[in-house]
């Protein structure tokens, strides 16, 4: 199981995604932990079982156990936070005086470099469409001194994974239906 298997499973109509996935996996401004953590966290965020299995297999070879768990933790906590803060934002400040009451300890103590965890959280927030979390994580990354190019590359990687997951899921559904 690997990114190569994932690329090979993509149908012809997803050729651009195949090329983009090849490109992001080998030519990037992200270091290895940033890249594989981003790929793993965003694969988990897509909820595509096949995409997650293939990326997770290779991510396990490229990340420490702590980074692997932190990337999955970023996807999980953002799954909650993105829904909460996106919804709170839609309600025009009517609930801003109320305490969230949500545990988010992993954000303060992720077990990896804070900037890497923030980067993964940003990429997942892009997939989940939460502008409030995107802005908050981007601001934290900039305060940590992370270059714009690194931030942009993580967003690009997450976008590629989201597109790949969509193509994989569509192809699997249509294949099962024999359409």
Swiss-Prot record:
Gene3D superfamilies: AhpD-like (1.20.1290.10). InterPro entries: AhpD, AhpD-like, AhpD_core, CMD-like. Keywords: Antioxidant, Disulfide bond, Oxidoreductase, Peroxidase, Redox-active center. Disulfide bonds join 130-133. It catalyses: N(6)-[(R)-dihydrolipoyl]-L-lysyl-[lipoyl-carrier protein] + a hydroperoxide = N(6)-[(R)-lipoyl]-L-lysyl-[lipoyl-carrier protein] + an alcohol + H2O. It comes from the Bacteria. The keyword Transmembrane does not apply. The keyword Oxidoreductase applies. Belongs to the AhpD family. Antioxidant protein with alkyl hydroperoxidase activity. Required for the reduction of the AhpC active site cysteine residues and for the regeneration of the AhpC enzyme activity. NCBIfam families: ahpD (TIGR00777), ahpD_dom (TIGR00778). This is Alkyl hydroperoxide reductase AhpD. It comes from Rhodococcus erythropolis (strain PR4 / NBRC 100887). The gene is ahpD.
